[in-house]
């Protein structure tokens, strides 16, 4: 048993002082606010572990390299494909490990990896058909982060169009072949990893193939899908099927309480209602959505309809859980010219317990007895946090990833403040990808 003494901690929906937390076999066994007994000190404000519900690890190699020209999501996508064409299982492992280490240093303790980079550049499977997925599982393990590998079905480059170029790496050819490959992943998982599934998007999964997800939805498996990130996708879907992407998913049994609609940016009122009635998660990725010029999604309307907000860093233009949380509120302010749409407590729930639950880790995201022992401590005396009140508002509206001093995942200390080492590892591997 290990006991930690938390100077301040977010417990039971509020900040408490001098909280003693006992940990045994990776679980929290005791939580004692206003404690008089001692423990390993964690000075600052300690939060439950944060969840990154949408990641494409290899996109991290694009940061700072896509800002030179005007363009759109679609022109950015061509640059992303260039990186996708350079990776093999070994380089993918190295890049993902460094990216996940950056997440850990930012306070993330779980990640949902939306994985579609499956095969060799010409589309031929590796001898081990899951070599790339195995690389991601190993990278997460070695970086110290829990992972839900969301193995992704990708069959078309657009409505009715075959994959072309690097997209051939993404496709298994048929939904049946994809399901067969995914089924072989289960033996590779452990206590810190799960397998979920994803439909890349309605443009990349033909309508008849969407039915492959209904059994996963019925079984409560995490099912994620890019949804209505772009206006063009909506228009193309209506032209092809006569309905919006959300309605198409609903009609084919893809929506349910363990479904995550990623982005959910350009929705009709009926779309919001359908997602809410399904009690689906809405995985917003504000830093990526603003980087790509996607737009601002209806976060509050979705929550009020019954959906549950979670947060991801997606393309990793920024890896900062605190920035993602506050960006939801800040974007709403820009869109409405009014303040106060989300409380700090609501945004912390989105960033912690609700996010973990959407990834299949319903026993993470709270500092409570029986929960996984995930603790994230932030400095309360940094230039960003000093003088801010030392409570949940400090975490959501002032702190940044650079303020994280300690991270514990499943009772194991995985980060102790060396942000410099994280940067050096990223610089090394990304440099070799661009200049082999």
Region roles according to the model:
Residues 64-146, 177-190, 426-435:
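Alpha-helical scaffold segments that flank or form the walls of functional sites
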Residues 48-60, 222-231:
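Histidine-centered catalytic micro-motifs
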Residues 64, 231-243, 271-276, 293-302, ...:
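Histidine/acidic-residue-rich catalytic or RNA/ligand-binding cores of hydrolases
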Residues 61-94, 120-129, 156-176, 231-256, ...:
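Active-site gating loops and adjacent loop-to-helix segments of metal-dependent hydrolytic enzymes
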Residues 1-2, 8-48, 185:
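Histidine-rich, glycine-flanked metal-binding segment
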Residues 251-258, 300-382, 398-399, 408:
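His/Asp/Glu-enriched, well-ordered alpha-helical/loop segment
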Residues 1-19, 24, 352-436:
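Active-site microenvironment of metallo-dependent hydrolases
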Residues 122-262:
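Metal-coordinating catalytic core of metallo-dependent amide/deamination hydrolases
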């Amino acid at each position: 048993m290990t006991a930690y003494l938390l100077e301040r901690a977010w417990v039971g929906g509020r900040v408490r002082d001098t909280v003693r937390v006992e940990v045994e076999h990776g679980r929290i066994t005791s939580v004692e606010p206003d404690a008089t007994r001692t423990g390993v000190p964690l000075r600052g404000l300690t939060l439950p572990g944060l969840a990154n519900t949408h990641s494409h690890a290899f996109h991290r190699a694009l940061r700072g390299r896509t800002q030179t020209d005007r363009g759109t999501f679609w022109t950015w996508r061509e640059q992303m494909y260039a990186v996708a064409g350079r990776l093999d299982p070994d380089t993918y492992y190295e890049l993902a490990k460094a990216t996940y280490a950056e997440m850990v240093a930012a306070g993330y303790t779980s990640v949902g990896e939306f994985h579609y980079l499956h095969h060799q550049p010409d589309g031929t499977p590796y001898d081990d058909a899951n070599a790339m997925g195995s690389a991601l599982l190993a990278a997460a393990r070695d970086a110290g982060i829990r992972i839900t590998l969301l193995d992704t079905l990708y069959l078309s480059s657009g409505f009715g169009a075959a994959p072309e170029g690097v997209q051939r790496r993404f496709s298994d050819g048929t939904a049946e072949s994809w399901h067969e490959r995914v089924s072989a992943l289960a033996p590779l998982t452990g206590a810190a990893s799960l397998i979920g599934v994803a439909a890349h998007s309605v443009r990349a999964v033909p309508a008849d193939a969407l039915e492959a997800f209904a059994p996963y939805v019925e079984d409560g498996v995490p099912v994620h899908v890019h949804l209505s990130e772009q206006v063009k996708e909506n228009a193309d879907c209506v032209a092809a099927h006569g309905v919006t992407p959300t309605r198409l998913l609903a009609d084919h049994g893809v929506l349910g309480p363990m479904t995550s609609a990623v982005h959910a940016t350009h929705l009709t009122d009926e779309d919001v209602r359908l997602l809410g009635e399904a009690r689906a998660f809405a995985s917003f990725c504000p830093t990526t959505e603003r980087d790509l010029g996607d737009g601002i999604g209806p976060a509050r309307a979705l929550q009020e309809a019954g959906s549950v907000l979670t947060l991801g860093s997606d393309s990793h233009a920024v890896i900062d859980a605190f920035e993602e949380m506050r960006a939801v509120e800040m974007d709403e302010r820009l869109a409405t010219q009014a303040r106060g749409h989300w409380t700090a407590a609501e945004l912390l729930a989105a960033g912690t317990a609700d996010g973990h639950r959407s990834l299949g880790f319903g026993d993470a995201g709270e500092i409570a007895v029986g929960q996984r022992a995930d603790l994230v401590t932030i400095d309360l005396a940094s230039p960003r946090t000093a003088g801010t009140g030392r409570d949940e508002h400090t975490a959501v509206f002032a702190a940044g990833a650079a303020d994280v001093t300690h991270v514990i995942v499943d009772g194991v200390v995985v980060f102790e403040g060396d942000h410099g080492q994280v940067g050096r590892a990223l610089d090394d591997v990304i440099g070799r990808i661009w200049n082999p």
